[in-house]
Amino acid sequence: MPQLDTSTWFIMIFSMFLTLFILFQLKISNHYYPENPMTKSAKIAGQHNPWENKWTKIYSLLSLPPQ
């Protein structure tokens, strides 16, 4: 049974990781990141939801009359 030649595995794996690292660095460097991001206020004022004006009742199955 022949032996598996693993002498080039280190170079291949190392070059793969190096290439992936460089590609990700190039991809990330193309994005614009603001220097001082403003924090958003957690308080939302004046937002109107269509379901706020409606009165709804959730019926429990046990409270319905028997059929």
From Swiss-Prot:
Residues recorded with modification N6-succinyllysine: 54
InterPro entries, alphabetized: ATP8_mammal, ATP8_metazoa
Disulphides: none
Entry membrane topology: Single-pass membrane protein
Localisation per UniProt entry: Mitochondrion membrane
Top-level taxon: Eukaryota
Protein family per UniProt: Belongs to the ATPase protein 8 family.
Official protein name in the record: ATP synthase F(0) complex subunit 8
Species per Swiss-Prot/TrEMBL record: Canis lupus
